[in-house]
Amino acid sequence: MQAAALLSGARGVTCKFIRRLRAGMDGCGMKFLFKRSLITGFLIGLQFVLIVLGIFTLSNKIVYVYAGLQVISLITLILVINKKDNPSYKLSWIVVILLLPPVGVIIYMMWGNTVFTRSVKNRINKSFETFRFQLPQNEQSEAKLRAFSRTYARQSEYLKRSTGHSVYNDTETDYYSPAEAAFPHILAELKKATRFIFIEFFILAEGKMWDEIHAVLREKAAEGVEIKIISDDIGSGDRQQEGFVRRLAAENIEMVSYNRFRPALNTFMNYRDHRKIIVIDGVTAITGGSNIGDEYINVIDRHGYWKDTFLILRGGAAISFTEMFLSMWQSITHKTYKLEDFCYNPQEECTDTNGFVHPYADSPFDNVDTAKNIYLQIINSARDYLYITTPYLVVDDEMLGALCLAAQSGVKVKIVTPKNGDHWYVHMMTRSSYGPLMEAGVQIYEYTPGFMHSKLIVADDEVATVGTVNMDYRSFYLHHECGVWLCHNKTVLDVRGDIDQAVAVSERIRLEAWNKRPAGTKLLEACLKLFTPLM
């Protein structure tokens, strides 16, 4: 009861504190210095500490409380073991619960448990399922892919069964890296809009990049084009000035935030919308690793030169991204839409000489690890080479084993990560993964010009994926993600060439040097491994 009272009181105090602090800063002209996520994060941490202190205080005074906590820990372990989840992911949480009682249980309840978010999950899943059954199925494209390769047809079939999206061979693709190379083309595509523009990004930050996009959106809204925008509240909250959404609404531009970040402990705050999507008239779609922010197009320097990607699709596959956006929009706004009202016009089909394009989405709420599984399929089917770029390399035993097995089977495996990390603890965990991979024969490179933010995988000059998926626990298990699987497509060679160029300016990490890391670094890496489910 005391712990519950502490939590209730902390929530009330923090909400009042946020309102008063914001009002005070607005009144003294300091509202742009106000970092909502920083203050909110601090207050959430304060609530966490108060709960832990309350539990320890009670358990030290009352033996029954201590015994009860042990029973709760045991029950939690049983629930985790029997949960329908990836075994490696479950094992990581079991270690946390066993080594940090009773704090480990609290951490799991806040960041690993999904029972308390069931109503929210059901609402989002219902929205996603509603649109999934409205997606067109392309049996002709599927037959052509089966005739080309049974192996790659099985990968595409998996994506279809797990997401509802089909494969297309009527879609042109243009790959751009770095992201600033795509920016003029993105503006040009936005200017072509006559019906609607949908935009969904994890980070939508004010600055030069946004200003140029906004100028086009404002013009198009004045022409009557329907414009809807989704941004993630944690990703974007601190990078938009006060009244940002209100000013857009005055220009007939609708904007909503996914999963508002509030100053109270809750189990849903861990799930974020990490997708990057632009859809224009249902005919053109844009995705990739880049967000909307000046560092992504190297207008400002953050962690050195920023290496990122965009992929522009024109043709039938654009409807998949229309569906992804509308399903998310409907889950947030509770408004009902029909995909047919925004669908692609078949009369504008491209030729079928562009290879195969299969968009896919991944949700943390459907108990299907789509992004991770398609990565595993590409890794396991590679024959000659497998190249990967990722900003983070924090993988479970299943992914680690697949990469090692590929290298041990004679496949040339190269992985490029950043030389400069954006989060020291994740960067340290990334580097801690190098050893077992290099021992198996995987070549590890660090991108020396700056920060490698591209999320790419390519194999055998035949198959690749471009999208938003990092090789870490958060992307595989906790985020909404999206990507494009490509086969027998010119973009596959573009991706391979891009990674070759990145390798040429990267530093190869050698096992001998890695083994000579300071003892303090090794100890800190070992401690951080306890928290891999959060990274």
Predicted regions and their residues:
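N-terminal localization/anchoring segments of enzymes in phospholipid and broader phosphate metabolism
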Residues: 5-7, 14-373, 377, 381, ...
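Phosphate-/nucleic-acid-contacting segments
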Residues: 385
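Helical hairpin unit composed of two closely spaced alpha helices linked by a short loop
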Residues: 392-413, 418, 423-425
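Short, well-ordered secondary-structure micro-motifs
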Residues: 240, 399, 425-428, 457
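Thr-Gly-centered strand-to-loop micro-motif
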Residues: 388-390, 447, 466-467
